[in-house]
Regions:
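Short capping loops/turns at secondary-structure boundaries
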Residues: 84, 102, 109-117, 139-142, ...
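Internal catalytic-core helix/loop-beta-alpha segment
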Residues: 78-107
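A glycine-rich, hydrophobic loop/mini-helix early in the fold
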Residues: 28-87
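Short, surface-exposed beta-edge/turn micro-motifs
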Residues: 15-17, 49-51, 106-108
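Hydrophobic/aromatic-rich, well-ordered segments within soluble, folded domains that form packed cores
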Residues: 105-133
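Long, compositionally biased
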Residues: 136-188
């Protein structure tokens, strides 16, 4: 149920990636769960009691990272001309440092999660303040469009919860949503 609640938009194919935090005892279970799916699993941080995974659809994430606006902001974060594996290694290092109170929060995670560039940049420029709405992320412009995306995420969560209540597991949910028809897979 926890995977379904935290990752419904990813599982239904309308989001490019998701963070998943679980108790450390479930680490290997999560890895096994996603090893035979179209969703890649990267351990971001392993603390004493919790682990954080970055789950993603590789092709869609690579496509998103090639958008000129995304590339420009990633370059500002110090990622220039590097591939996804290198990006994820560096993000994991920065995120782990943040979780251990050694480094500032790596805002590039917002881009890797498919958040709109304007909202990631707005968050940084405004220090997380002066947003026009707070939902799945803090919104700094295009509120109507973002509300539509949030509504789709809410609907995905409701649908996944219903499927789990009816006995579906992650594999059945992924199979059911194999060909997403949503318009907001990636918000630039």
């Amino acid at each position: 149920m926890q995977v379904g609640l935290q990752c419904a938009p990813l599982l239904t194919g309308i989001k490019v990636s998701n963070l998943l935090g679980v108790d450390r005892q479930h680490r290997d279970t999560v890895i096994r769960l996603f090893c035979t799916t179209g969703i890649s699993c990267r351990l971001l941080c392993e603390c004493s009691e919790r682990v954080t995974f970055f789950l993603f659809r590789r092709e869609k994430l690579e496509e998103y990272l090639m958008c000129p606006e995304v590339m420009a902001l990633m370059k500002a974060f110090g990622y220039s001309g590097v591939g996804l594996v290198d990006i994820l290694s560096k993000v994991a290092e920065r995120y782990s440092g943040y979780m251990k109170c050694r480094e500032p929060f790596p805002h590039e995670i917002g881009l890797l999660l498919g958040y709109p560039v304007a909202d990631v940049a707005g968050f940084i420029q405004n220090g997380g303040k002066d947003f026009i709405y707070s939902g799945y992320w803090k919104v700094y412009e295009n509120l109507e469009e973002r509300l539509e995306i949030f509504e789709e995420y809410d609907q995905a969560k409701e649908q996944v919860v219903r499927m789990i209540a009816a006995g579906a597991d992650v594999h059945k949910i992924l199979k059911f949503h194999r060909t997403p028809s949503r318009k907001h897979q990636i918000a630039v």
